[in-house]
UniProtKB/Swiss-Prot annotation:
The chain crosses the membrane at residues 69-89, 184-204. The lineage of its organism: Eukaryota, Metazoa, Chordata, Craniata, Vertebrata. Residues 125-184 form the P-type domain. This is FMR1 neighbor protein. Testis-specific. Expressed in melanoma, sarcoma, lung, breast, bladder, esophageal and ovarian cancers. Residues 90-183 are extracellular. It comes from the Eukaryota. Keywords: Membrane, Transmembrane, Transmembrane helix. It comes from Homo sapiens.
Length: 255
């Protein structure tokens, strides 16, 4: 009986010693893995990284577009207001513009509401930036065309002036008026279109630049998650191997 008890105690000591060695090796391996990757030492970090939901393409697009799009819209509105006030000050000058040869700028429409032909590209450009009209508004004083009052309709149109047969003024042929609302709208539209054409390539380029770091960060996150999963699988296999080795030692000691 005493010999049997001694053998049982010896087997128990050997099994306990083998289990302690296995636990010590496992703890050493986990400590080395933790030092190589400090982020994995936080409790629940691996599970949080593995179970973290990946953002969809809509959320990613919103994150990338929100900040530069807001800055772009703010700059567009600021420049539009600047263009509006500049056009207002440009339009607040004289009521008509006289060319160097003494002719009045071609009006946008004659007394019959028909458009006059543009004689040259320069006149077309000036007519765009300085449009004129023959509509007489309140608090406007009509001036004779080239200081000539008694002109026939053909001569008046040849001088690119406005002819009125209704007798609303003391003379029938008068100089056209500056079309301030039309000029302001044209300047405003030109500024808006120019701003969009200038800022759109810059915005697209900045969006492309922002997408590259985001893709790199996403790839780095995927690599970290993959590495953590591999380390977890290695530790699991290592613990299983140590447990099998401990059982084998125990069985060998029993024999």
């Amino acid at each position: 009986m005493s010999s049997h008890r001694r053998k049982a105690k010896g087997r128990n000591r050997r099994s306990h010693r083998a289990m302690r060695v296995a636990h010590l090796e496992l703890a050493t391996y986990e400590l080395a893995a933790t030092e190589s990757n400090p982020e994995s030492s936080h409790p629940g970090y691996e599970a949080a990284m593995a179970d973290r939901p990946q953002p969809g393409w809509r959320e990613s697009l919103k994150m990338r577009v929100s900040k530069p799009f807001g800055m772009l819209m703010l700059s567009i509105w600021i420049l539009l207001f600047v263009c509006y006030y500049l056009s207002y000050y440009l339009c607040s000058g004289s009521s008509y513009f006289v060319l160097a040869n003494g002719h009045i700028l071609p009006n946008s429409e004659n007394a019959h509401g028909q458009s006059l032909e543009e004689d040259s590209a320069l006149e077309a450009l000036l007519n765009f930036f300085f449009p004129t009209t023959c509509n007489l508004r309140e608090n406007q004083v009509a001036k004779p065309c080239n200081e000539l009052q008694d002109l026939s309709e053909s001569e008046c149109l040849r001088h690119k002036c406005c002819f009125s047969s209704s007798g609303t003024t003391s003379f029938k042929c008068f100089a056209p008026f500056r079309d301030v609302p039309k000029q302001m709208m044209q300047m405003f539209g030109l500024g808006a279109i120019s701003l969009i054409l200038v800022c759109l390539p810059i915005y697209c380029r900045s969006l492309f630049w922002r997408s590259e770091p985001a893709d790199d960060l996403q790839r780095q996150d995927n690599r970290v998650v993959t590495g953590l999963k591999k380390q977890r699988r290695k530790r699991k296999r290592k613990s299983e191997m140590l447990q099998k080795a401990a059982r084998g030692r125990e069985e060998h000691g029993d024999e």
